[in-house]
């Protein structure tokens, strides 16, 4: 979603020209994308236009995978070299046998290197929709104008025809002691 969308084909250039600082993070229950920028009506309109368009019209292209995968691989390797992070991952996988909280949010190295572009595109189309999102606007803004702009940019997006299923897997009762021991070479 950082590469481009139908109305915003060069997102990195636009972010730079607006003096915006973007980022995104993923955790167990959410992914978030954001940008910070100087408070102005022009910047707010631009940001809402950008976010509404990339929510449903992002270029998720095979040609961009290799550069993105190198970024994700680096994040993966940084995590593998963080003893506290590795320990937390092992604790979660011990506590949650079936629930997704027991799985790493970044996935395995094989997931990162071998995921088909079609899977990423299908995930994006299924989950990146207004009915599955929260929009937060903070800063020096006029509340009424901001709500009107949100309606202007996000209102025309049609409600998706798909229905999101709630997870049906139930985590079994933790009926006994569980422990984790992690041993690795290195310094903390």
Report each predicted region and the residues it spans:
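M16/insulysin-pitrilysin zinc metalloprotease superfamily fold
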Residues: 3-5, 36-68
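Non-catalytic beta-strand/loop surface segments
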Residues: 7-43, 78-132, 156-188
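Hydrophobic face of alpha-helices
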Residues: 8, 12, 48, 66-69, ...
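Conserved short hydrophobic interaction patches
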Residues: 18, 54-57, 152-157
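Short beta-strands and strand-coil junctions in structured, solvent-facing domains, enriched
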Residues: 41, 57, 61, 143-144, ...
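Short amphipathic alpha-helices in soluble, non-transmembrane regions
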Residues: 47-53, 147-154
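Non-catalytic, conformational "gating/processing" segments within enzyme and secreted inhibitor domains
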Residues: 69, 84, 121-153
């Amino acid at each position: 979603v950082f590469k481009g969308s139908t109305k915003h084909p060069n997102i990195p250039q636009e972010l730079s020209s607006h003096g915006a600082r973007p980022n995104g993070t993923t955790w167990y229950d959410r992914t978030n994308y954001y940008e910070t920028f100087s408070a102005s009506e022009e910047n707010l309109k631009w940001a809402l236009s950008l976010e509404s368009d990339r929510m449903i019209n992002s270029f998720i292209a095979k040609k961009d995978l290799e550069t993105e995968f190198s970024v994700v691989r680096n994040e993966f390797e940084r995590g593998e070299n963080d003893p506290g992070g590795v320990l937390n991952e092992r604790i979660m996988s011990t506590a949650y046998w079936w629930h997704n909280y027991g799985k790493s949010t970044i996935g395995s190295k094989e997931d990162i290197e071998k995921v088909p572009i079609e899977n990423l595109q299908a995930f994006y189309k299924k989950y990146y929709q207004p009915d599955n999102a929260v929009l937060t606007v903070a800063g020096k803004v006029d509340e009424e104008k901001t709500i009107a702009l949100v309606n202007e940019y996000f209102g025309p997006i049609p409600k998706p025809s798909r229905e999101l299923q709630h997870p049906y897997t139930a985590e079994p009762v933790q009926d006994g002691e569980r422990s984790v021991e992690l041993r690795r070479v290195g310094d903390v």
